[in-house]
């Protein structure tokens, strides 16, 4: 099955209905390890087959720099809501909301270096649909403006055991021992996951992966 084949016709039609009313912004939200990137990639591929011009911008590009988190004593909870530049993310979404700018550059998080690369993702004026993925798109507080900037938010849902296994495997892949991987998965990652799970009912659509 192709990546695009992971998207149902109903889901694709729903995304297509967002296109054509000016630029649309679609949020993909979910717990750590829920498959947000898989869902986003599948949707991008399916929309590309329909001739829709798209771009993917991740919330993770607004991680506070690893060095800064270390200096602040926050590196052990990296990924928590307090470890992101929320205002910067909101500002970017506002720029993307209005395609008057010929070109907008967005940052991209690179797991292999545990940091974001600035001006890594180009979003041109002719892009019809921007997909933005992240954990906290529906969280309240300083994150609240994000919901108002998005046309819809879809929640990526997956069984908890599978989600935790994926997350631990990811941590191992990037250099943690199995023990360290599970400690992180069941520690700060689990606290973050509960924060995200509490927002599930606010999503416009729940997509089971």
Name these PLM-found stretches.
Residues 1-27:
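Extreme N-terminal, non-catalytic leader segments
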Residues 36:
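Conserved lysine of the Walker
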Residues 33:
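Walker A (P-loop) phosphate-binding loop of P-loop NTPases
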Residues 39:
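Hydrophobic positions on the alpha1 helix immediately C-terminal to the Walker A/P-loop
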């Amino acid at each position: 099955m192709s990546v695009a084949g992971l998207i149902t016709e109903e889901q694709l039609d729903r995304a297509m209905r967002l296109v054509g009313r000016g630029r649309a912004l679609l949020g993909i939200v979910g717990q750590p390890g829920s498959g947000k990137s898989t869902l986003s990639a599948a949707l991008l591929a399916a929309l590309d087959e329909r001739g829709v011009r798209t771009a993917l911008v991740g919330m993770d590009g607004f991680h506070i720099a690893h060095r800064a988190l270390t200096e602040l004593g926050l590196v052990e909870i990296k990924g928590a809501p307090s470890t992101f530049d929320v205002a910067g993310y909101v500002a970017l979404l506002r720029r993307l909301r209005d395609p008057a700018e010929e070109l907008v550059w967005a940052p991209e998080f690179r797991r292999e270096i545990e940091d974001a690369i600035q001006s890594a993702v180009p979003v041109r004026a002719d892009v019809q649909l921007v997909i933005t993925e992240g954990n906290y798109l529906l969280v309240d507080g300083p994150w609240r403006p994000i919901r108002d900037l998005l046309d819809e938010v879809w929640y990526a849902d997956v069984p908890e055991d599978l989600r935790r296994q994926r997350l631990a495997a990811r941590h191992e892949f990037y250099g943690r021992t199995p023990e360290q991987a599970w400690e992180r998965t069941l520690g700060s990652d689990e606290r973050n996951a509960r924060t995200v799970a509490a927002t599930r009912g606010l999503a416009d659509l729940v997509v089971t992966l």
